[in-house]
Curated annotation (Swiss-Prot):
Coiled coil: none annotated. This is NADH-ubiquinone oxidoreductase chain 2. The chain crosses the membrane at residues 3-23, 25-45, 67-87, 150-170, 178-198, 201-221, 237-257, 274-294, 323-343. The keyword Transport applies. GO terms for biological process: mitochondrial electron transport, NADH to ubiquinone; mitochondrial respiratory chain complex I assembly. It catalyses: a ubiquinone + NADH + 5 H(+)(in) = a ubiquinol + NAD(+) + 4 H(+)(out). It is a multi-pass membrane protein. It comes from Mustela kathiah (Yellow-bellied weasel). Keywords: Electron transport, Membrane, Mitochondrion, Mitochondrion inner membrane, NAD, Respiratory chain, Translocase, Transmembrane, Transmembrane helix, Transport, Ubiquinone. Its EC number is 7.1.1.2.
Amino acid sequence: MKPPILIIIMFTVISGTIMVLMSSHWLMIWIGFEMNMLAIIPILMKKYNPRAVEAATKYFLTQATASMLLMLGIIMNLLLTGQWAVLSTLNPIVSNTMTVALAMKLGLSPFHFWVPEVTQGIPLLSGMVLLTWQKIAPLSILYQMAPSMNPHLLMTMALMSVLVGGWGGLNQTQLRKILAYSSIAHMGWMIAVMTYSPTLMLLNLSIYITMTLGTFMLFMFNSSTTTLSLSLTWNKLPLITSLILIIMLSLGGLPPLSGFIPKWMIIHELTKNNMIITTMLMTITALLNLYFYMRLTYATALTMFPSTNNMKMKWQFESTKNMTMLPPLIVISTMLLPLTPMMSTLF
């Protein structure tokens, strides 16, 4: 893809998301979603091959269906209230229709089937955009709609997402699929606390995006896409491999890393609102996520694969890739826990 075309496409993707974030008019929000969806497809197919085309087609069909449902909800809301404003969405049927549409866009369970397949079929850079930037616009609309949404529907989808995110990643060897299932689980945690503390959801989103960006950048740095290729990099790039494992444990929510903060605060918020059983179920299923990250860490760091001396010296001759954002992302992804008392005063 030529640089000018790529710049135009990226500008359209960013403009679509910003339009959704800044609008309180349903038609402008829908147009922003469509701009974003149509512009992201060439990015998904940046490396043109059959798997990328299949992934982009699955993504397009899912997002088009979600956009159709969203437009149906917008029209129903217009007929019932005569208004285009987001905050006028008070009818339960309209609210549920829009919630389902946005859940499809986010990849929440039971509409999660496209997320692992699409993420696996596209390059690492495209996967990074899909699992971070593409989550911002739908979550911003859910944030605005939080007072009028059905809490039982949200909690059901949240529980299913956390369960699917943990269960689905157990037997995976592809790193992109593991991150896709981790994304589903994180979305579940965000949706669970949406009706009780929408601001806490934003904290969870920011920490999730930071950790996922750092993980994808490290994967791109050492060109790892499978657990086998990751385990073989221990001899070549020991420091980078160690950082990958620490960030992945943070994604799993292991204390004292940054990924533990949102889970801790969400558990506190849910128990404060007497959601004891739901919190217990979510906490138990979150252990599945932590388990497959710890298993990956054990296989990579504590079991050394046979290697030659030439392989061990190979890292000295590799050209280094310039990733300026990597050090701050790694620090934020691992060392934010001491700031928790200050954060707790804000939510």
